[in-house]
Structure formats: C-alpha cells, structure tokens
C-alpha cells in the first residue's frame, strides 16, 4: 500500500501514448524467453490477473483495525494506538504479541480463500511479508520465526488451487519508505549499512528457498523490495541492491526464477537502463503501483479525469523494455477508509487530514463510506467505470494485481466486497463501460 508520503509523487505527468507493444527484439528483456528457452512464466504472453494477500503476514491498521482498536482509550482520539506492526509488538511485548498474531495468522486467511480467489477467475496472488519473519535486528520488538510456515501453506494452497505466486519482501529493516505497511512508519533508513546487510541476508534466503525445484511451478517471481521511496533514497545504492539480488539469483544460485523490482515511484522507462539485455540480464519484471487517492488534487478529480489518468497508466508502459505488471491498484476514489493514511491522520476527502504542516479541505463526505447500500447509483457507476478503465489499461501489458483481497471493514480496497456488490466485473472480462480508453 502506498500511503502517507505518496502524495509527494502525485504530480507526475502521464502523457498519453499511442504506440503498440514493441515488436520482439533482442533489445527487450521481456522477449528473451523464447531465445533462452527458460522455464519461467512468460509475462509477454500469459496475462496476470491477481490479487494481493494484504494485511496478513504483515499488519496494516486499515486492513485489520480490530487488532489496533484493542489499544483505544479515548473514542475521540487515536492517541496511544500503535501506528504499525513494530509499535504493536513493542506495546504488547513478545509473548502477548505472538499469541495475538498467531490467532490472526491462523484465521484471517485460510485455504478456502485461495480456492475462492481461483473461482473468481484470478490466476495469481502476491504475498507480502516483512524481513522480521526470518531475522531481526537486536533492537527489534517484532515476533519472528513464525510467519514462514504460513507463507509456505499459502504457496501450497495456491498450487492446489492453480494459482501462481509472487513472494514480496514488503518491509525492510529501518523501512524503505516510511509507510506503515513497511512495518515501521516515518523512517526510511534501509540503505544504511546494518539495515542493508540484513536485507541482503533475508533476500538471499528468499531467493534460494523459493527458487528450488519444488516451488518453480508456482512461485513465478520474487520481489526484491516493495515500494522503495525513490525521492528520499540514494538511487545508486538502490540500483546496487537490485543488481545484488539479480546476480545472487543468476550467478550464485544458477536459477531462472523471475526477479521483480519495484519502480521506486520513478517515471516510465526509468528502469530501461538497469538489468539490461546488453548486460546479459533477463527474466526481470518492473512492478508499477497506481493510486489516485493520496493527495487532495487527485481526490478532487472528476470521474472522467480519473478514467483518463487510468488509461494513461496503460499506454505509459508500452515502450518499457522490461516486462511490466501493475502490482498494486484499487477501486478507491476517496481516502475515507479508516486509517488508510495512517493511524491518527484523518482523511483528505472530508478535510479531516492533518499531518505535520499539511492540511486538507472538504471535497466530499465520508459518512457511510463502508456501507454500499447507502451509495448513490452515480457513485456505484463511477467506481465500476474506474475499475474497468484500470483493467483495460493494465491488460495492455503484463496484467494486474489488485490491492487487496479482503479487509475487515472497507469497500474500495476489498476485492471480495467489490465483486459481491457488482463494483468489480465478474467475470473479470465483463464490461458495463466498454472501450473507455479507446484502445
């Protein structure tokens, strides 16, 4: 999830393009599949239609607010409520935190969920997990060593249901972005030596384990790090980290597993010069995340403007040389979901957002936001239009992975509720508003 600092990135210009997908060429990494005859998933011909398993093995307050509401002492204030998993574990202590998290892990997702995902016409899941599941810093309060067994269960459930999997390193020590979904909010020091060294230890373990023969028919990508916040990071060091992960996989392990790199919120084609064919690289996916709800300017757009931007997300990647997938996106046209911007921050949409020097203004009401039965027909149709435009755009290239499959209370971020309410196509190819983008 792309949260509190992301509004800084909302001013990117999305220029509409009309080029077709480029012809197969040895200069395009995504087209080396046929040349190398590798067994990996061919993202140029096999479309991804997936969903994220968010808020399970790595907590996000807005996905499971009940875990965090247990700390509330004042119905009018979020004071004292942990803002992320780090502070959740710190507040409870290791024994109680482990007990509560075990109860969450064992119930929030079960095998039936993965069967339901497949039955809904999807073919892939992306599973976020934090570094602390495998190893921690001495000062970390996290519960560790327990999440991996659930990850392995999920991979087996996926295999049994006919789903493919991305294993996504979603949180790095020191945080890579300052978002609560990294485990530690308002920090971004993962490229400091101690933190980077531990990140490398963890990613080496993930690459080694999930590139083994028994996983290769199901795990079709390992994401080296989720959403590194490019504007506040040393991009040269980030590129070195990406190169490290790629080299370890190809040269040390000799594996043809797929490497997934997030775009770090850089512009289209930025990564064309990284892990290139000329350097001998292949089997690389660039992961783009797209939202229009984390700045007041975005929230104030008309539905036609929202749809136009969504369409440009599709055309914008047509000339990128790597495989590309939209690894996160949602139906959100508001930021009204409780704690979507973080515990204690409010919503820009209704003007209640405050953080540091940033304020907000009233755009619309958040009342009854999570009760679809109260929505106007116009609002329902607008959400459906927005979803369909994104589906059309993302299927111009490698496909999409919706964020996320389920939450405790939200609608715009909950694929189950959206499908049940008729706001997400079923089947996923159904269109009430065809040809919005004119592709």
Swiss-Prot record:
Its main location: secreted. Transmembrane segments: none annotated. GO terms for cellular component: cell surface; extracellular region. It is found in: Secreted. Its EC number is 3.2.1.58. Pfam families: Cellulase (PF00150). Disulfide bonds join 311-437, 336-366. GO terms for molecular function: glucan exo-1,3-beta-glucosidase activity. GO terms for biological process: cell wall organization; glucan catabolic process. The keyword S-adenosyl-L-methionine does not apply. Belongs to the glycosyl hydrolase 5 (cellulase A) family. This is Glucan 1,3-beta-glucosidase. The lineage of its organism: Eukaryota, Fungi, Dikarya, Ascomycota, Saccharomycotina.
């Amino acid at each position: 999830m792309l949260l509190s600092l992301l509004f800084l990135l909302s001013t990117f210009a999305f220029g509409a393009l009309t080029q077709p997908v480029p012809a197969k060429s040895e200069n395009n990494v995504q087209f080396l599949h046929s040349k190398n005859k590798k067994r990996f998933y061919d993202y140029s011909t096999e479309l991804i239609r997936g969903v994220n398993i968010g808020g399970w093995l790595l907590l996000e307050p807005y996905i499971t607010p009940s875990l965090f509401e247990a700390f509330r002492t004042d119905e009018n204030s979020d004071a004292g409520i942990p803002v992320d998993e780090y502070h959740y574990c710190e507040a409870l202590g290791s024994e109680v935190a482990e007990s509560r998290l075990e109860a969450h892990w064992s119930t929030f997702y079960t095998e039936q969920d993965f069967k339901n995902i497949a039955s809904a016409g999807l073919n892939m899941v992306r599973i976020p997990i934090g570094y602390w599941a495998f190893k921690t810093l001495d000062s970390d309060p996290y519960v560790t060593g327990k999440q991996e067994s659930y990850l392995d269960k999920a991979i087996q459930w996926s295999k049994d249901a006919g789903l493919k999997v991305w294993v996504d390193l979603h949180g790095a020590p020191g945080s890579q972005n300052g978002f609560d979904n990294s485990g530690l909010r308002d920090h971004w020091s993962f490229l400091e030596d101690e933190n980077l060294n531990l990140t490398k230890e963890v990613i080496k373990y993930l690459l080694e384990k999930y590139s083994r023969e028994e996983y290769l028919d199901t795990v079709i990508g390992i994401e080296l790090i989720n959403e590194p916040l490019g504007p506040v990071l040393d991009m040269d060091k980030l590129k070195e980290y990406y190169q490290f992960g790629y080299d370890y996989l190809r040269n040390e392990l000799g594996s043809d597993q797929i490497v997934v790199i997030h775009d770090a919120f850089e512009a289209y084609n930025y990564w064309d010069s990284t892990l290139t064919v000329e350097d001998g690289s292949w089997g690389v996916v660039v992961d783009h995340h797209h939202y229009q709800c984390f700045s007041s300017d975005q929230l104030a757009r008309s539905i036609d403007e929202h749809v136009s931007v969504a369409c440009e997300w599709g055309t914008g990647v047509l000339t990128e040389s790597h495989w590309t997938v939209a690894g996160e996106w949602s139906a959100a046209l508001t930021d009204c979901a409780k704690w979507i911007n973080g515990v204690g921050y409010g919503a820009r949409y209704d003007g209640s957002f405050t953080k540091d020097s940033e304020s907000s203004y009233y755009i619309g009401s958040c009342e009854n936001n999570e009760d679809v039965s109260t929505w106007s027909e116009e609002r329902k149709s607008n959400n459906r239009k927005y979803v369909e435009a994104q589906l059309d755009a993302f299927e111009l290239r490698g496909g999409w992975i919706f964020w996320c499959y389920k939450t405790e209370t939200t609608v715009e971020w909950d694929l189950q509720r959206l499908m049940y309410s008729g706001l997400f196509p079923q089947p996923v190819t159904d269109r009430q508003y065809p040809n919005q983008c004119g592709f």
